[in-house]
């Protein structure tokens, strides 16, 4: 089956500072992701399903083989990834329904078997927006042929604008994600 595919490695994702689906579209030609108030609108090569909450997305995201096809579910951060594969065009033969526009396939990093405990942590701060983001992962060998990996991220932000009427900053963010 002929496929148009672009693959970004986990190291490349970190180097480019890609932290969410919206920033991914800056580096993949033909992919447009717009964040609305409560969901993403995803278009690949101009094909998408728009903002109708009753429809599944025409471009489906897969995380470790599990389909995520509602726009609200795309809000999860890109956490501890080995690679992201972007397959353009209809992918119904390989991935099934709701893939008429294409597929964004995310593969999580696997634990290291037989090695030592491995940790990675990062802290990002944007003082002018009162934003703090902490991310980390640990790979723990349990035996010579079994290991586990735990990854987590937390982000807090007071927002990037000031509402004079309510006398507060916004829109605020407070999110946590954990994968084991």
Feature locations, PLM:
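N-terminal periplasmic "start-of-domain" segments of outer-membrane beta-barrel proteins
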Residues: 1-12, 16, 40-43, 59, ...
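Non-catalytic regulatory/gating segments with a bias toward low-complexity or hydrophobic composition
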Residues: 5, 13, 24-25, 84-89, ...
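Short, conserved catalytic or interaction motifs in soluble domains
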Residues: 10, 30, 89, 109, ...
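Short beta-strands and strand-coil junctions in structured, solvent-facing domains, enriched
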Residues: 14-15, 32-33, 49-52, 68-70, ...
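A general structural signal for stabilizing positions within well-ordered secondary structure
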Residues: 15, 22-25, 75, 94, ...
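Extracytoplasmic beta-strand/coil segments of soluble accessory domains associated
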Residues: 22-66
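Outer-membrane beta-barrel translocator/receptor signature
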Residues: 57-58, 70, 79-82, 93-163, ...
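Short acidic/polar hinge/loop motifs at secondary-structure boundaries
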Residues: 64-90
């Amino acid at each position: 089956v002929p496929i148009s595919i672009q693959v970004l490695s986990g190291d490349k994702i970190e180097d480019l500072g890609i932290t969410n689906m919206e920033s991914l579209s800056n580096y993949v030609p033909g992919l447009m992701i717009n964040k609305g108030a409560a969901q993403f609108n995803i278009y690949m090569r101009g094909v998408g399903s728009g903002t109708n909450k009753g429809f599944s997305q025409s471009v489906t995201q897969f995380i470790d083989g599990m389909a995520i096809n509602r726009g609200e579910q795309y809000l999860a951060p890109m956490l501890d990834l080995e690679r992201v594969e972007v397959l353009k065009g209809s992918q119904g033969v390989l991935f099934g329904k709701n893939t008429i526009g294409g597929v964004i396939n995310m593969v999580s990093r696997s634990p290291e078997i037989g090695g030592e405990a491995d940790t990675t942590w990062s802290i990002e701060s944007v003082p002018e927006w009162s934003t703090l983001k902490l991310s980390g992962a640990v790979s723990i060998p349990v035996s010579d042929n079994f290991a586990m990996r735990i990854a987590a991220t937390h982000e807090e932000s007071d927002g990037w604008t000031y509402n004079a009427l309510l006398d507060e900053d916004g829109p605020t963010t407070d999110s946590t994600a954990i994968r084991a």
